Amino acid sequence: RLAVGVALVFVLASLLGAGAQPVVSTKQDIAVFSLGYYGWFIPFQALGTIDLKIQEVFSDIGRFRVFGTAQRLSSHGLQQFIDALRRTKQGNVVVPEQYQFGEAFLTKAEFERLTGAFIVVVPVVTNFAVYWDAKAATWHCSITTGFTFIDVAHDATVIAVESIDTSGSDKTSMNSAVMYAINAIPPQLEYKIRSIPQFQISTRILEAQGPTVKIQLGANMGLKKGDEYAIVEKRTFGIIEDTREAGLIVITDVSQQVSTGRVLYASAGLNADTQLKEIARQGVDFDLYFHSSGGQMLPGFRMTASRGFYPLRPFVGIQIPLGNAIVTTVVDIVPVNAIFGAEYMIPIGRFHIAPYAGVGLTYVHIAVPPIGYESDSLTHLGAQAGGRIGYLVSRDIRLYVDVGADYWLPLDRIHFREYGGLTIGAGISFKL
């Protein structure tokens, strides 16, 4: 009896331990149809480019084993395909030698190959327009692409339907306008994929030493510097298991199978096997701020690249020197400073310090409504440097103060004056 009791204890301990093990994502099999476009005229070269870029996104994102098909489904054919998948999953269906889904045909072998994937993705164009804007003397192109994600492994359930709107314009070439619209698809598609819960990376801490942690998975699953992972805490209430976010980690370095992270905050101590969950972001911090420099008021915004960059992060910014702006019924003078630079991010828990520097140009639009006169010109060259101290008030928002210096040199000293000096300011940052 003692031996049986000890054995039962070990079995129960084993089962409980197995239930507490963290989840670690592995690559999923995914099949991607070619782009369906029935009802829309799309240049053949553009069609091939869209197909290639869509395939590249699913391949480069790192978390899938991808195989594609040359077949294209229309919106009507998509529903027929889903219905056929469901009938096949339910069994007792005579499998034909050839399927027809709208305008597309699949052989029995092609259909079975697709149903062998865990997920099937069907992209379909729902809008494609190219037109010449005579007033602006510009070609414009707009594309709306729908993506339907079908979980073939579980009764052909549609797990997500995403729509991506892109546009492009060019003054000299229609083809260039189309390509600009096409090139805008991949970054939006990647973000959409990473936002779908079934595709988000789950992983665990391998080792914790103070604020530095080693994390299972790396470039082999598409992790990048600047990615953020939530620390997940599991609680059990009776027979209900609940989870909540209990902290935040930013990825600071990535190797092939292991990544290094920095703990920004955590509500409890961390150890090996702590569960982590990917937070999908577009990879940009959007800052709104108000600066004062040498008596000049400078409201503005800044966009800093966060995904793929750490600790050096490039940024672009726009600010308006209010002291040089004139808006009346007679004349409008609107100056805008465009700034390009980089910051060096140093996190210290919820706080961070970020020295930064940048250079810029001032663009001025002058309009005289009574006589219909308008002109645009570059008026200043500028530079700025300083430091930022920020505090992470929540997972997605920072508050910060800036101290530094600005200097703006006029290109035309007859009509414009230099300005700048000690800069102080404050703002709010949204992690998008």
Language-model features: locations:
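Amphipathic beta-strand/beta-sheet edge segments enriched in Tyr/Trp
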Residues: 116-169, 258
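Short secondary-structure boundary motifs at beta->alpha junctions and helix caps
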Residues: 150-184, 238-257, 375-378, 404, ...
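Gram-negative (and chloroplast) outer-membrane scaffold detector with strong preference
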Residues: 302-388, 393-397, 429-431
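Outer-membrane beta-barrel "beta-signal"
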Residues: 419-432
